[in-house]
Design a protein with these regions (language model features):
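N-terminal pre-P-loop "Q-motif" helix
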Residues: 7-23, 221
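Acidic, low-complexity intrinsically disordered tails
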Residues: 1-4, 639-666
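A basic/glycine-biased coupling hinge at the interface between accessory DNA-binding modules
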Residues: 2-6, 23-26, 31-34, 45-207, ...
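Conserved RecA-like helicase ATPase core segment
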Residues: 2, 7-8, 46, 220-316
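Short glycine-/polar-rich loops that comprise or flank the Walker A/P-loop
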Residues: 24, 52-56, 81-84, 231-233, ...
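Helicase P-loop NTPase motor core
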Residues: 28, 32-40, 54, 102, ...
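Conserved helicase C-terminal RecA-like lobe
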Residues: 351-363, 376, 383-636
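Hydrophobic residues in beta-strands of the RecA-like P-loop NTPase core, especially within AAA+ ATPase
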Residues: 211-215, 237-238, 568
Length: 666
C-alpha cells in the first residue's frame, strides 16, 4: 500500500507533487535522470490505491520495452494483477481501436500491418505498374513522401506532384490487400474518431485518466490522437531539451500546444539521480544556448566528480585507438566491466574504425542497429505464412510464400495470377480460386494443381490456427507440413551448418510464441494478437548475449540509457552539429545541440570526448574544426589532452593485469 507517508519518504518534493496531483491537466517537465519512470509508475500505483479502477487508466509510451517496464514496476508496487490496466505504445493502442471498429472505414478486422519490407515491396510494385523509370524510383525518398503526405507534414506541390499517382496507387493497394502501414495506426483511428463520434465517445467514457510518456517525442498526429481521447484528467511527461526526433515527425512544440489547449499545472523535476555535478554543469552550459526551450537547471547530490576529458586525436584511426586503449586502461584501473562503457557516435558510419580497434584489442562489443531477428529470411518466411493464413488478401506476403518452398509456381504463373486479379477486379487469392475452378481457364492443369496444393495448405492450417489454443505447436506442424527444412537444405546447397542456424532461429521463434501464449497476463493468445505484437515489437529489446560487452551506438539509439563511462566520438563541426543542419539554418542546430545534451547526460561517472583534427570524407582527408558545442562547456569543467601513444607492450601489460583481476573476481 502506497500511503502518503510512504510516498513522502520515497520521493523528493517535486516528485511527490507530480505523483499525488492526479486530477486535471498536468505537465511534468522531467529533466534527464530525474526519476521520470519512477514518477510515472508511482503515480499510477497511487491512483490505483486511491480506488481509481484500472480500466479507467490509459498510459501511452513509445516502445514496447518502456511499456513492459512500466507495467512490471506498477505490478511490483501494487502487488495486484493488472488485467484491466492499459499500458501501451501509441501504435499498439491504435491497433486496438482499429480491430474493434475498422469495418466502419471499409476494412475487415483481420487486416495486416505492413512492416517496412512489405511497404517497400508495395511501393516498388506500384512504381512498376505505373511505369516509373528506375531513376525516378528513389524508394527512401518516396517512402518519406508518402509518410509525410499521409500524416500532413507535407503538401503536394510542383516538386513532388509527379508522385501523386504512385501515392494514390499505394493507398489503393493497401485497401485492396486489407492492409495498413505504421502511419495508418495513428491516422486511421483519428479518422475513425472524427467520422464516427460514437466510437470516440466509447473510449472517452472508458478512459478517465490518461498519461503520456516521452511527450516531447509525440508527432502532430499523436498529439491530436491524445487530444481527442483526453477529457480533463491528462498528465504528460517530457523534456523539451531531449527532443531529438524531428526527422520522424516529433514536435516538441506539442508542449506549448498542450499548455494552450488545457488548463495546465506545471511541475518540474530538476534533481538528477544519475550523473555527477560536473557532467550536469556541462550539460546545463551547453543546452542554455538554445533559445526555444523551457528554462531549467539540472542539479545533483552525487558530488562534483571528475573533470570532463577532451582529446584531440589526429584522425579517426587515432581516435579509435584512443577509445580502445582508454577502455582497456579504465577497465583495469577502475575494475570496470566492459558493459559499463558506452561509445556514442552521431552517425553509424563512424563505427567502422572503432570496431576495427576493438577487434585488434580483443574488446568484446555490441553495436546497435544490426539485423533484426524478425528480418531474417527464415523468420520472415514463417511470419508471411501466418499473415496469409490470417488475411488471404495480403498479397505482398502471398507473393513471398506462394513458391516458398518451391512448388512449381514461377514468375509466369504469378503474372497470370496478377493479370486475372486485375481483369476480375479482385484479390489474387480470389483470382487463384477462379483460375482453378473455371473450365475455360488460361491456367494449365499443372498450374491449377500447383495453385490448389498451395491453397489447400493455407486453408488446412487456417482451420487449425484460428481455433483453440496451442499456437506454437500448430505453427511447428505447419513448418513440418511444408517441408521447410528440406527446402533450406536445397537452397543452401546442403550447408548443414547454415541450415542448423536457421532452424535454431525458427525454434527460438516457436519458443518465444510458447512463452507468450502461456503468459498468465495474456488472456487472448490468438494468431491476430500475435501478429500485432511482432509487427509492433520495438527493436529495443536487450539481448542477453550483449551482457559483458562495450556498447557502441548512435546518440539517437542511446536515448533512455545510461553508462558509468561514456565516450562521445567525433565532436566536430560537420558531424555534430551535422553539416546539413548548419547549411539549412532552420533551427536544426538547436536539435543538434539537444542531441549533444542527450549524449552528455548518458554518463554517470566519467565523460570523455574526442574531436579529430582531420577526417576522411568521400575518399578525401580534410582538416575539421572542433564542434562549437565544446566551447559551450564551461572551461573550468574540462581537461584537454593530447592522445597518449600506448606501446604494444603497455597494451599487453594492461590486458594481462585486467585478466588477472577478472580471475581474482571469479
Amino acid at each position: 500500500m502506497l500511503n502518503l507517508e510512504t510516498l513522502k519518504n520515497e520521493l523528493n518534493p517535486q516528485q511527490y507533487k507530480a505523483v499525488t496531483t492526479t486530477e486535471g491537466a498536468i505537465l511534468i517537465i522531467a529533466g534527464a535522470g530525474s526519476g521520470k519512470t519512477r514518477v510515472i509508475t508511482f503515480r499510477i500505483a497511487h491512483m490505483l490505491d486511491k480506488g481509481i479502477p484500472q480500466s479507467q487508466i490509459l498510459a501511452l509510451t513509445f516502445t514496447n520495452k518502456a511499456a513492459k517496464e512500466m507495467a512490471d514496476r506498477i505490478k511490483s508496487l501494487t502487488q495486484k494483477k493488472l488485467q484491466n490496466l492499459t499500458v501501451s505504445t501509441f501504435h499498439a493502442f491504435g491497433v486496438k481501436v482499429l480491430r474493434a471498429d475498422i469495418d466502419k472505414l471499409g476494412y475487415r478486422d483481420n487486416f495486416s500491418i505492413y512492416d517496412e519490407t512489405d511497404r517497400v515491396s508495395l511501393i516498388k510494385e506500384c512504381g512498376r505498374e505505373l511505369k516509373f523509370s528506375p531513376e525516378a524510383m528513389d524508394i527512401y525518398m518516396i517512402g518519406n513522401l508518402i509518410s509525410n503526405i499521409k500524416t500532413g507534414r507535407k503538401n503536394w506541390d510542383t516538386s513532388n506532384d509527379m508522385y501523386r499517382p504512385l501515392y494514390e496507387s499505394y493507398q489503393e493497394g493497401l485497401k485492396l490487400f486489407n492492409a495498413v502501414d505504421f502511419d495508418d495506426l495513428i491516422v486511421l483511428p483519428i479518422k475513425l474518431f472524427k467520422e464516427h463520434p460514437e466510437v470516440l465517445a466509447k473510449y472517452r467514457e472508458r478512459y478517465k485518466y490518461i498519461m503520456v510518456d516521452e511527450f516531447q517525442d509525440t508527432s502532430h498526429q499523436q498529439y491530436e490522437f491524445m487530444h481527442l481521447l483526453a477529457d480533463k484528467n491528462v498528465a504528460v511527461v517530457g523534456d523539451d531539451d531531449q527532443s531529438i526526433y524531428s526527422w520522424r515527425g516529433a514536435d516538441y512544440q506539442n508542449i506549448i500546444n498542450f499548455e494552450h489547449d488545457f488548463d495546465v499545472t506545471e511541475i518540474r523535476l530538476e534533481q538528477n539521480y544519475r550523473s555527477t555535478g560536473t557532467i550536469l554543469e556541462a550539460a546545463n552550459g551547453v543546452i542554455s544556448h538554445n533559445t526555444n526551450r523551457k528554462d531549467k537547471k539540472l542539479w545533483s547530490g552525487n558530488g562534483a566528480g571528475k573533470p570532463i576529458e577532451i582529446f584531440m586525436p589526429e584522425d579517426e584511426t587515432d581516435e579509435a585507438d584512443f577509445i580502445a586503449e582508454s577502455i582497456l586502461g579504465i577497465a583495469c584501473e577502475e575494475k570496470r566491466k566492459y558493459d559499463e562503457f558506452g561509445v556514442l557516435m552521431r552517425s553509424n558510419s563512424q563505427g567502422r574504425f572503432i570496431e576495427e580497434a576493438f577487434l585488434q584489442n580483443n574488446i568484446p562489443y555490441t553495436m546497435s542497429g544490426g539485423t533484426s531477428f524478425f528480418e531474417r529470411k527464415e523468420i520472415k518466411d514463417v511470419i508471411s505464412y501466418l499473415r496469409v493464413i490470417a488475411n488471404h488478401d495480403d498479397e505482398i506476403n502471398l507473393i513471398r510464400i506462394i513458391n516458398c518452398p518451391r512448388r512449381g509456381i514461377g514468375r509466369a504463373s504469378i503474372q497470370l495470377l496478377n493479370d486475372e486479379a486485375n481483369l476480375q477486379g479482385c484479390s489474387m487469392w480470389n483470382a487463384m480460386i477462379s483460375l482453378v475452378q473455371r473450365q475455360e481457364s488460361p491456367a494449365s492443369e499443372t498450374v491449377k494443381e500447383d495453385f490448389s496444393e498451395f491453397m489447400k495448405i493455407i486453408e488446412e492450417h487456417r482451420q487449425k490456427l484460428l481455433t483453440g489454443r496451442g499456437l506454437s505447436q500448430k505453427i511447428r506442424q505447419l513448418i513440418e507440413d511444408i517441408n521447410y527444412k528440406d527446402y533450406l537444405l536445397t537452397e543452401y546447397s546442403k550447408n548443414e551448418k547454415a541450415v542448423r542456424f536457421k532452424m535454431k532461429n525458427i525454434e527460438s521463434l516457436l519458443n518465444s510464441i510458447e512463452v507468450w501464449e502461456n503468459d498468465p497476463d495474456n488472456d487472448n493468445p490468438n494468431i491476430f494478437n500475435y501478429l500485432n505484437r511482432i509487427t509492433l515489437m520495438s527493436r529495443d529489446n536487450e539481448d542477453e548475449n550483449d551482457k559483458g560487452k562495450v556498447n557502441l551506438m548512435t546518440i539517437h539509439a542511446s536515448k533512455g540509457l545510461e553508462f558509468p563511462v561514456v565516450f562521445i566520438a567525433g565532436a566536430e563541426e560537420g558531424l555534430i552539429p551535422h553539416a546539413r543542419s548548419v547549411e539549412e539554418n532552420n533551427g536544426d542546430v538547436e536539435e543538434e545541440r539537444r542531441l549533444f545534451y542527450v549524449a552528455i547526460t548518458r554518463a554517470r561517472d566519467k565523460l570523455l570526448i574526442s574531436s579529430c583534427r582531420k577526417r576522411r570524407h568521400m575518399q578525401m582527408v580534410s582538416e575539421v574544426e572542433p564542434s562549437r558545442f565544446l566551447d559551450e562547456i564551461p572551461a573550468n569543467l574540462v581537461e584537454y589532452h593530447e592522445p597518449k601513444t600506448v606501446t604494444i607492450e603497455e597494451t599487453g601489460k594492461m590486458f594481462g593485469d585486467f585478466l588477472q583481476q577478472l580471475k581474482s573476481q571469479m
